[in-house]
Amino acid sequence: MHVHPSTPPTELDGARVERYASLDGIVHLARVTAFIDGAPAPKPAAIAVAVYPGESDAYVFHCSPDWSVLAAGHHASLEVAVLAAESGFPGVAERWVMQHAG
């Protein structure tokens, strides 16, 4: 059984969280590795897909257990962001928790 981190805030870095998922027990395929200060970013505990107000682009936020953003990936749309997250984290599709309708 997977464990959900606490419910994320409604916004991360000013972007509205549309959906989120725990990554407990999910292997990150690491097709793209995020770096912080020249070192690989730590493995996220959860991911969130979010959209900034007035934008159609979406972001996949890699988050710590307390929902601090560790890294982010930019995508052309919400649908593309979701597919990218599901491709990078096989099994996450069954774990999405919807934060907002529509």
Q: Where in this protein do the model-derived segments appear?
A:
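Short, Lys/Arg-rich amphipathic alpha-helical interaction segments
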Residues: 92-102
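Compositionally biased, low-complexity repeat tracts
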Residues: 10, 21, 34, 69, ...
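A generic structural signal for short, solvent-exposed coil/turn residues
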Residues: 9, 41, 52, 88-90
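Negatively charged, low-complexity tracts enriched in Asp/Glu with abundant Ser/Thr
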Residues: 1-41
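Short aromatic-glycine-(Arg/Gly/Cys) micro-motifs in beta-strand/loop hairpins
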Residues: 41-70
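Compositionally biased, intrinsically disordered low-complexity segments enriched
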Residues: 4, 30, 77, 101-102
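A short, charged, amphipathic alpha-helix used as a generic interaction element across diverse proteins
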Residues: 74-91
